Amino acid sequence: MFGMGSKTIVGLDVGSSSIKAVELKKKGGQIEVAHLGLEALASDIVVDSMIVDSGTVSSAISKLFTDCLIKTKAVATAVSGHSVIVKKISLPSMSDQELAETIEKEAAQHIPFDLADVSLDYQILSEEAGSANMDVLLVAVKKDKILNYTNVLSMAGRTPSIVDIDALALQNCYEYNYQPAPGQVVALLNLGASVMNINIVKGTTPLFPRDVSVGGHQYTDSLQKELDLSFDDAESLKLGNKVGTVSEDAKAPILQQVTEIIVLEIQKTFDFFRASAAGEHIEKIYLAGGSAKVPGLMEALRQEFSMPVELLNPFQRVVPPTDGPGAELVEQNPGQLAVAVGLALRSFESL
């Protein structure tokens, strides 16, 4: 959204529990992974989508690039959370130049921040010939939020070329890998550690991007407290691994309680969407993110919403690495790399 592209861009997803880096290359008629890696972060380094400890994150980025042998300087990253506002607005049809001249005035009516404090971007969603109106997606991000991320990238010796938002990077990943039919409406869910990005998409048009302040850390916190576990053991248990003598009967109800909270937030979002998009029907849910594979979550979504639910695979068309740590990451949980892949695909915008 914000910034200028360059030839090759590394997709860098700075999350609450880890940093993911993906660099892609074009080979023949395909796009394949050149470099890919993940660096874990302690839970107090990135809090509520803000980088609290810049030095630690900067060092982690440098280490990740060194370990992955990434020499490219240009980086695309993404932000989410309370400092990000995304609104679909309807305006009288006008030329691109007229829109550029009036967008700030229109934004002032829809953005709950002082416009001096935000960076604005917009995208025309639909403009039918002869129609009196046009739909525009308005994106506003607080400048201090952008600086919070770009300063850390600069500290790590990288060039912040693009700052996107997570929900749109997720969509970019989906579009390239799944090549959706123009009328197909799906819900993309990215369940990170502290934030869930939701983007309801029709074909290649974002209809309803939204961030919700629930995430995988709630599973981990509940398991820690209820079963008196360390953070690492709770995290492992959350992802379906066996830990000590903890039984399935002890774990399942704790996971289910958090799943119910997450499902409720998704239900609210779907209700908001249906109220604002008359006649549109969500056909399928794609689930991504580090906590997408929590036991019971996919089944709960299928039961609650009575529609197909599947894990979003960022390597449906993007060719993954075949060996090394990158291949292991893809095998373990490809969905946690969806935002980073979507960002890295910005290198090939014309495809």
State the predicted function of each range:
Residues 1-40, 59, 74-78, 132, ...:
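Gly/Thr-rich phosphate-binding beta-strand-loop-beta motif of the actin/hexokinase/Hsp70
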Residues 1-106, 147-149, 157-159:
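Non-catalytic, solvent-exposed interaction/assembly segments
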Residues 43-46, 143-172, 178-180, 205-246:
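Glycine-rich phosphate-binding loop plus the immediately following alpha-helix
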Residues 78-178, 284, 314-321, 336-339:
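Active-site neighborhood for divalent-cation/phosphate handling
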Residues 258, 280-316:
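Glycine-rich phosphate-binding loops at beta-strand->alpha-helix junctions
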